[in-house]
Amino acid sequence: MLLDGTINKLDTTQNFFLKTIEGLEEKDGLFKPQDGMFSVAQHIAHTAQTVDWFIEGMYSKAFNTDFDALEKEVFAITSYEVALKWFNDAFERGRSKLRDEGEEALKVRLAPGPIMGGVPRYIVIGAISDHTAHHRGALAVYMRLLGKEPNMPYE
């Protein structure tokens, strides 16, 4: 039951994000409101990377805190399509990992530490959803700046 719920949460998180950004396309990938901000493609790439980061971290001894290296990986992404593939693949990897590890593994507490230390693993799925929603909202603003109407994700 817990496993099904966490997989369902990943599914709805992914689907809400994709529904919202449906009107974006490759030509929008490099758009950013100003220097120093993520582009459309980089927002999507960062969101994908963070899904992978959370899933890897929840089954490891600690989360990767080499944020400079993680940021460089995201800033290298310039294609909307490449970022979108990473996003979809990250969610599929997440679902596969949850299934492979099984329900009981979701109840195991994370090691003490600065990132979600001591919480049961399944709580991490809520953090994935929250983080993804944050970037979904940012991309909705970007879409409006591009003259596009973001979709209501819940339809």
What residue spans do the PLM features occupy?
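Basic/polar N-terminal segments that are highly enriched at the extreme N-terminus
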Residues: 1-4
